[in-house]
A protein has these predicted regions:
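Short helix-perturbing small/polar motifs within transmembrane alpha-helices
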Residues: 143-186
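C-terminal transmembrane helix-loop-helix hairpin of multi-pass membrane proteins
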Residues: 169-179, 198-253
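Membrane-helix interface motif
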Residues: 19-27, 186-198
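Hydrophobic transmembrane alpha-helices
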Residues: 27-104
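Hydrophobic cores of alpha-helical transmembrane segments in multi-pass inner/ER membrane proteins
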Residues: 46-55, 145-155, 220-231
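N-terminal secretory/membrane targeting signals
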Residues: 1-27
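Alpha-helical membrane segments and adjacent membrane-interface helices in multi-pass membrane proteins
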Residues: 85-148
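Hydrophobic alpha-helical transmembrane segments
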Residues: 71-76, 115-119, 142, 167-175, ...
Length: 253
């Protein structure tokens, strides 16, 4: 990867980190804050998430062995996820709305590697930026690093097969990966805090409705931004994308 293609990502990453580390305001949760879920639900979501993490590690090891030149592209996917998911708007109590950034890495490498990349991003934000928490990392990672990428990948393949238009498929993948993350987060919150009147369904409608106000515009914006970044990669990283097409899942197929 050419140095000039790395500079914008590194500058954006550094600026975001600086602003959040030097912010005097209280940080909102990265999805679900530390201690917000009961120990039972925290353990449950960790148990659901960990198998995907293990499979993702195996996929990443395979990628780096077969095509070590793609390590910088993996780093770019992680930086893109970190920067976008750090741009938050306060939403439902104990949570927040923001882009997820997992769509780009999903269409390049497939959903399994993003289970690792996304969870590492969430871990860094929990430790360095006080967004989210360690006990709730399993729940947050399952929604953003598992559900989002798998849904995005499914619709990427579906739209690409139906229309043959790559950029439309990338837009759909990024937008729906974002929206599905928040549908899953709403389900997690509704399961943990069912409404006294109406139970799980009423609570789900409440959480999803509040999220939708901010998340639908954010998801559309993320889809457009991801397409713009893809255009940039095509212009300056054609060799790496050609290697992806030969060796990887995602855009490659």
């Amino acid at each position: 990867m050419k140095l000039r293609t790395c500079i914008p990502v590194l500058v954006t990453f550094a600026l975001t980190l600086y602003l959040y580390l030097n912010s005097a305001e209280s940080a909102y949760a990265m999805h679900i804050m530390e201690g917000f879920l009961s120990p039972g639900w925290s353990l449950f979501w960790w148990a659901v998430f960990l198998p995907f993490f293990v499979l993702g590690l195996r996929a990443l090891v395979k990628i780096t062995k077969e095509a070590p030149q793609l390590k910088l592209m993996l780093g770019l996917a992680g930086a893109f996820t970190f920067v976008l998911s750090a741009l938050k708007l306060p939403s439902v109590t104990g949570s927040s709305s923001h882009p997820t950034g997992v769509g780009l890495g999903t269409v390049m490498f497939g959903p399994l590697p993003m289970s690792v990349i996304g969870s590492i991003v969430l871990l860094f934000q929990a430790v360095l930026l006080a967004h989210g928490g360690l006990t709730t990392l399993g729940a947050n990672a399952f929604s953003m690093a598992v559900v989002g990428p798998f849904v995005g990948y499914f619709f990427f393949k579906l739209v690409l097969k139906a229309t043959g238009k790559l950029k439309l498929a990338i837009f759909a993948a990024a937008m729906l990966a974002d929206l599905s993350t928040y549908v899953m987060t709403s389900i997690q919150l509704a399961l943990a805090f069912p409404s006294e009147a109406g139970g799980f369904a009423a609570s789900l409608a409440k959480f999803a409705g509040i999220f939708a106000v901010t998340q639908i515009p954010l998801a559309i914006s993320e889809g457009l931004l991801t397409v713009l970044v893809w255009n940039w990669l095509q212009s300056f990283n054609s060799e790496e994308l050609s290697l992806l097409k030969r060796t990887m899942k995602g855009v490659a197929r």
